[in-house]
Structure formats: C-alpha cells, structure tokens
Curated annotation (Swiss-Prot):
Region called Disordered, residue ranges: 99-149
Protein name: ATP synthase epsilon chain
GO MF term set: ATP binding; proton-transporting ATP synthase activity, rotational mechanism
Gene expressing this chain: atpC
Assembly description: F-type ATPases have 2 components, CF(1) - the catalytic core - and CF(0) - the membrane proton channel. CF(1) has five subunits: alpha(3), beta(3), gamma(1), delta(1), epsilon(1). CF(0) has three main subunits: a, b and c.
Amino acid sequence: MADELTVDIVTPDERSFQGPANGVRAPGIEGSFEVREDHAPMIAAFGIGPLIVKTQAAHEYADMHNDRIIFATSGGFLEVIDNKVTVLAETVEPASEIDVERAESAEERAKRRLEEGVQEEERETHEAARDRARNRLRVAMGKVGTRQS
C-alpha cells in the first residue's frame, strides 16, 4: 500500500496545486465522492462545489487546522491512477484568495437577472453564475465541512 496520494490540480490557465495528500473530496455530478490511497482507477466528472484536499503538511492555502485546502470549483474532471489524482478543472480558487465582495456582487447580479425574467436559453447561464457565486461565498466563509454541505 502507498502512504499517500499525489495530487495535481490544473486549470486551462495554471497549475493551482501539486503535492501529497491523504484524500480528495470532489462535488460529483451525482453527489460528492472521496478518493483515498489505493483507490481503483477512475475518471469522474464533477460540478460546481467545494473541492477539498486533505493535506499531510502545512500549506499556504491550508485552513486554520492546516489539514485541508478548500477550493471553490466550477466543474471539470478528476482522474485517479496509481495513487495519483489529477484534477482538470474549469476554475479553482483557494478559499483564502476569494474576494467576498466580488462574489456577493456576482450573486446579486445573477439573482437580479433571474428575477427580471430572461429567455429560457439564458436562464441556465444565470443560474450557473448564481450557483458559482454561492459556492465561492460558502467556501470563503468556511461553510464547508469534511463532507459536502
């Protein structure tokens, strides 16, 4: 058995995290799921929600207990092969770097547009914007447990 996972989180723009971890929890399309050492190989899609990396050591993005890093993510894919977890995400943002005022403004803007009435084809876009903003706020305010809330 391996002692740890190696986690690599990348977006189209950058590598957001690379390092050892005890586990990764992702907001799966059909519900959250967790990957730990010696997990079977898999590829899974995930959606808007918190992405939690359970770290083995202090990290600049770690929460106050230095045992996990919480990212707000807007979806992507996660691959597990031989204790290596690769997360290919549309966006990820560590909780410590989320601009709360900007997220609140984005949520209000999306809610206002939905209340004003939009064409059906625009509704999904505004609902997704609202959901992304709400996720960013939850992550920034620490309203995320070890299990997806």
